[in-house]
């Protein structure tokens, strides 16, 4: 890939570029997620730094190109976290870049705790961005009750850089739980994830290894509460062989999940499929993949299949979105006619020159 990269150092620089540019562009953060392009790249890597952090208010404001690792380090010092556990793709995709906080929200990157606290977009409070006409727009605020521009904030989360160049984000953070434990349930079916999430014991993570028939159920909170809920879940699953991963072992396991290390052994093509939680097992039965895992209580399916196996063609009868991460298929799931119409309507308002990330929209 021999694309020219522009790295503006300020929001004003971004605006100047967009006012004068007529050729299609690709917006990138730390380039830690795989999107093939030969277009000129606008990198936000120089829009870097934490602008404001109020631990007591559970909010942070940062420039979009701030590395995710810098955000995490600052939060760790105050025993706080990005509760939605944004996953790191760079190790899996063997890319040199580092995830940025703007990239996290632009791709709505959300980890296992999504089932408890929501996705990345649910933690985004406000956003500044420059649209395709060179307008600097700001929506949302730094506190949850400020809902000015609420819909646009949510729209930018998960837009993959198709509506504008995000320059600044404000978001909520949460305290790190006092302790955690994970139940590892042996020789079980995937339906046990739903059984666990439907208990009153506030499960914060579920994961299922289809090949090994192993389920992992995470509990977090205050020490006494975690011990009580673990005891109750042991009773709930008394018909199964259950091991307990105590705090450090549990933390290590879920960190490996966030780093996607469980996918490193996959040979062939790698797919990430989002469906209704009740359809996760159905996808496995239809596709019969070589390797598969379930997250989000079955709503997120990771698939390792033979090279050239068309997952989208096989899953046509199941509503969902299949992204090809490693393979020779288009990375993004094709949009329906209605989705394209709605997307184009929104896009015309923010990018009338059709500058941004065309390879994603197409």
Feature locations, PLM:
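Short beta-strand-to-loop capping motifs
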Residues: 184-189, 217-223, 273-277, 303-307
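Glycine-rich N-terminal segment of FAD-binding domains in flavoprotein oxidoreductases
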Residues: 2-89, 309
